[in-house]
UniProtKB/Swiss-Prot annotation:
Keyword list, A-Z: Cell cycle, Cell division, Cell inner membrane, Cell membrane, Membrane, Transmembrane, Transmembrane helix
Organism: Pseudomonas aeruginosa (strain ATCC 15692 / DSM 22644 / CIP 104116 / JCM 14847 / LMG 12228 / 1C / PRS 101 / PAO1)
Membrane topology annotation: Single-pass type I membrane protein
Periplasmic side: 1
Pfam families: ZipA_C (PF04354)
Keyword Cell membrane appears in the UniProt entry: yes
Annotated localization: Cell inner membrane
Basic and acidic residues bias locations: 81-99
Record's subunit section: Interacts with FtsZ via their C-terminal domains.
Cytoplasmic side: 23-289
Protein's UniProt name: Cell division protein ZipA
Family stated for the protein in its record: Belongs to the ZipA family.
Biological process annotations from GO: division septum assembly; FtsZ-dependent cytokinesis
PANTHER family in the cross-refs: CELL DIVISION PROTEIN ZIPA
Amino acid sequence: MDIGLREWLIVIGLIVIAGILFDGWRRMRGGKGKLKFKLDRSFANLPDDDGDSAELLGPARVVEHREPSFDEQDLPSVSAREAKERKGGKRQEEPRQGDLDLDEGLALEADPSDAAETVEPRKGKSKGRKEKEREKAPAVAAEPAPVDEVLIINVIARDESGFKGPALLQNILESGLRFGDMDIFHRHESMAGNGEILFSMANAVKPGTFDLDDIDNFSTRAVSFFLGLPGPRHPKQAFDVMVAAARKLAHELNGELKDEQRSVLTAQTIEHYRQRIIDHERRSLMQKR
């Protein structure tokens, strides 16, 4: 029996659909688990100004001769613990930087002190601007839930000098991030730093923290925004706020957006992140039944 053109098209279509479904299943399986920030010990093709090589997190894709390279081997693997029952509230479209109007009567279930193990706490902290910033952060004490997966957006400076401390601080403060636990920045429900934590931003260079007392002399080649799942009460809206903050930083400080694999962050990648959030919410609902 001869097979016509129509039958061949049907067979080819079924094969393509099966391939798409398998690729989506593989990506979801590969995206689960704990966040691993990789701290590198060297940059490729960068001048050695002071004898100390910069150290960036994770493997890098070299897109030009000034782009940093990342070694997978001698790098410590650190797990993210940004696990909080948090509240968020924004629509699916690009959010504005402002307070999130969420239910105020719900109990907070987060522990900012366990926000991320990607950074190393500093010893002998001084009482300068750090103390003032920390007074703005709410004190929350609750047992964190395990993190299933973490959504990461990296912003890498295009300039060799990196992001300068004062300009970086001004930019992220305008986006509502506030300095807090683990010596990193957190975005709360309110722009004033009140309410539940939606996402956080860590320094992508060792030790992964920020020193506000020496911010005038501070610079870094990259920062990492991250949001843990399970986490905010409204993770899709919180993710949109995180995307807006990362885009603002990249646009105003001449940075480049990268995903968790150090590939260029495209609109398709952002939609894939949103789909991961939807899939995680669906799995959580099924487990509760």
